[in-house]
A protein has these predicted regions:
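Conserved ATP-binding/catalytic motifs of P-loop helicase motor domains
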Residues: 1-186
């Protein structure tokens, strides 16, 4: 388990030091936020706005909070900013139910992690360290539910020019399997 945790640590450290080609101007971010607020029928609070803006400027972002704190609403504005500016995005979650919730809330199709990676067998994936996903942004919801092994597979499949956003509640039940990666990152 130590080896997997060290691989995760080293990959995240390496990716965090790289700059991506992804840039959205502050004006376009404000416009996307405005569109998301109009569609949702409410305005973001200061903390949510800060999280949205930071997530759109950083290579790796973690969004955490209890149920009902607006993580999914925040994600809607982030998705809107990327899609309105012609960036590609993959949205994944551990369960199909969580993926469906993301799809409904953001109007962007989400999939299970296994489907995103193209599962072809036990711990075998089409997208992996030798064949990266081609996407501008990789979003993982319910990150607190993902064990270290699956998290490593997901992380290895992400290209160095891809932004990473992980959301979750580190106070939820820990993942099935070893490694509580999200809590460790917080």
């Amino acid at each position: 388990y130590y080896d997997i945790e060290m691989q995760i640590y080293n990959l995240l450290l390496e990716k965090s030091k790289k700059e991506t080609d992804i840039y959205i101007s502050d004006e376009k971010i404000e416009l996307a936020i405005h569109h998301a607020e109009e569609e949702q029928g409410f305005n973001y609070v200061v903390e949510q706005l800060d999280t949205i803006k930071k997530s759109l400027h950083r290579t790796i972002s973690l969004i955490t909070g209890k149920a009902g704190t607006g993580k999914t609403s925040i994600m809607r504005a982030i998705v809107k900013a990327y899609t309105e500016n012609n960036f590609t995005l993959t949205a994944s979650a551990l369960s199909a139910m969580a993926a469906q919730r993301i799809t409904e809330a953001t109007e962007f199709p989400a999939m299970t992690i296994h489907r995103t990676l193209g599962c072809i067998g036990l711990n075998e994936f089409t997208f992996n360290k030798d064949n990266h996903m081609i996407t501008s942004v990789a979003f993982l919801d319910e990150g607190s539910m993902v064990n270290a092994s699956l998290f490593l597979h997901w992380l290895e499949a992400i290209d160095d020019n891809t932004r990473i956003i992980i959301s979750g509640d580190h106070k939820q039940l820990p993942p099935i399997g070893f490694g509580n990666v999200f809590s460790d990152l917080i």
